Amino acid sequence: VCPAAITVATAIARRLAGFGGAALNFDYAIGEGGVGDSLQAVRRHGKHGVLQDPGLADLSAHVDFGAIARAAREAGAVVHGPMPQGELLERLGIQTRAEALKRRATPEQSADIAAAMERLLDLQQMGTLFKALAMTAPGLATPAGFL
């Protein structure tokens, strides 16, 4: 668990509970109960050695959305999720939006849209590796996609 992430989530949740509003978070994450070392490096969209080429690769680790959700609830916010990014985007109509974009796209743009959709939704890519978590003020409707 990252103490700074809990501090930030608590501050956001308190603000939402006190003043209203909503927050939507997407990140490379685990859900409830995940434990372990998830530090990794990514370079040019591929796995890379964590200590190889310092400064030239992006370092990341799974966010513990379960811990963030607990902290947000304790601070007074209503928590929705976490859920896989792909599932949320599907519920929000990403397929319909992509088809609308493709109707006015060049063949090259259409191929780019298809590739982006695969990356965002595929179960082996960002579709399940990334999670979505929403926090809302008490009394607000459940955010679209989280119903």
Range-by-range predicted roles:
Residues V1-L147:
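Long, Lys/Arg- and hydrophobic-enriched amphipathic alpha-helices
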